């Protein structure tokens, strides 16, 4: 209940302050949270050291602080969903390689939109809607129903159709057969170790089977995309070339193909990778 009230208070504050002041307030509370968040500091430090084994503790700490601050700004943007419109998208968002979206849809086999807990993946769905592309996203439900409804109401207020994790398989397959776009977060398996084991930054971890599994079953293309925050708090939506499975692909080999792309972006923007839990096996 406390977390829900904090979200509601944060939402109210953000909706009544200019964006610049909302960000400043978010950074202040992020720094305060950082002091007391022992587990979050521990997990993020371990994850960053796995990616950058040669960096000093001071360098890791600097990245980690920026990560906490960026995540706080991510929440500000998410709370502001009801007032984000096409004017905002036009002013604050640049889309790179937009042609890859049409290229993927032209195959008429559906598109698995593959992203990560990087930058602002939630805003990515809103941008696709603003560009005129119907969009479905698989979301992990919160244990607290009020928090779950709070998040989903904001997603759906901007045309992002939410598919609850646990009920996703049949609906995703059906949507892909209708040449729709289905978004999945591909950098963390939430199915109690039922994912596929892959090497990620040279260490074993579980990644979800969903993106590769759906692509292999339907012939859908996997379209990697990442909404990255820029230093001036604008965004760039980076689209990568669609990945098409070949006759020899398995879930493991196809997962490795897009895992390499996620590695590249996470390494380039580690201060925007919000993995506040143990990642590797």
Task: Go through the PLM ranges and name each one.
Residues 36, 62-65, 103-105, 130, ...:
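Non-catalytic C-terminal accessory region of glycerolipid acyltransferases
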Residues 1-4, 39, 43, 123, ...:
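Generic alpha-helical secondary structure signal
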Residues 9, 43, 99, 123, ...:
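Short Gly/charged-rich anion-binding patches and loops
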Residues 2, 60, 120, 147, ...:
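Hydrophobic (often cysteine-bearing) scaffold residues that line and stabilize catalytic clefts
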Residues 28, 42-47, 59-66, 70, ...:
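A non-catalytic, amphipathic alpha-helix used as a structural packing/dimerization or gating element
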Residues 107-166, 189-196, 203-205:
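Catalytic core of membrane glycerolipid acyltransferases/transacylases, capturing the structured
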Residues 1-115:
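Membrane-anchoring hydrophobic helices of lipid-metabolizing enzymes
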